């Protein structure tokens, strides 16, 4: 069976890494759950496929401070299958003490396919021919085994065929006010959710500093001598060997 170009592209794009950022900007409950204790924290649970987040308005035993900064969360995930019209984000608002003791205040859904389609389309427009770039790099890369004839044409020096460590990520920031409903289909309030979806491509690359280890034994120092010798200030110790004293000159 012959695979066309569109199917081949979708298979490569299945390995994309996505990041979702959430923040509850505002929450208004007009029809409260009378069974829910007011002192319990208000928790917003967000579920989308394998993603699950729990955003609380405060910690247990503390009061809500309107002047405190709002708390948001982010998650990094992949898609095990392409997005369809049936993929929705489930949002539940609870008065929750523990996982086994929580009271539903309202729930709602948010379709996710339009957001994913726009972010993915922008990724392809920002990273033109990234798939052929990866395939060309893998096929022309010098290898220890097998013929390396394709690696002799210096194609790696052409900028249009440069393979990057990480492709240009694309994102979309949206702010939605969604109605909340109870299990009787009655509206109980509204929630304002700020959501940001980031498409990172097939990989994420970042650098990090590594500090050189400090020798524990000063008499067996593994660090090299300082570049300036003799030292600016006269010292009775040898900087390369702290256990050895430097004989003082007689004047």
From Swiss-Prot:
Keywords, in A-Z order: Apoptosis, Nucleus, Transcription, Transcription regulation
GO cellular component: nucleus; RNA polymerase II transcription regulator complex
Domain of life: Eukaryota
Cellular location(s): Nucleus
GO biological process: apoptotic process; positive regulation of apoptotic cell clearance; positive regulation of DNA-templated transcription
Entry's induction text: Up-regulated in response to detection of apoptotic cells.
Observed phenotype of the null mutant: No loss of viability or obvious developmental defects. Reduced levels of apoptotic cell receptor crq/croquemort in macrophages during embryogenesis stages 11 to 14. No effect on macrophage development or distribution, but reduced ability to engulf and clear apoptotic cells during embryogenesis.
Main location class: nucleus
Keyword Coiled coil attributed: no
InterPro entries assigned to the protein according to its UniProt record, in alphabetical order: Bfc_dom
Pfam families on file: Bfc
GO function term, MF aspect, one: transcription coactivator activity
Keyword DNA-binding attached: no
Quaternary structure, from the entry: Interacts with srp (via GATA-type Zn-finger domain); this interaction enhances srp binding to the promoter of crq/croquemort.
Function summary: Transcriptional cofactor involved in efferocytosis. Together with srp mediates expression of the phagocytic receptor crq/croquemort in response to apoptotic cells, and is up-regulated by crq/croquemort in a positive feedback mechanism. Involved in macrophage engulfment and clearance of apoptotic cells during embryogenesis.
Protein name according to UniProt: Transcriptional cofactor Bfc
Gene label: Bfc
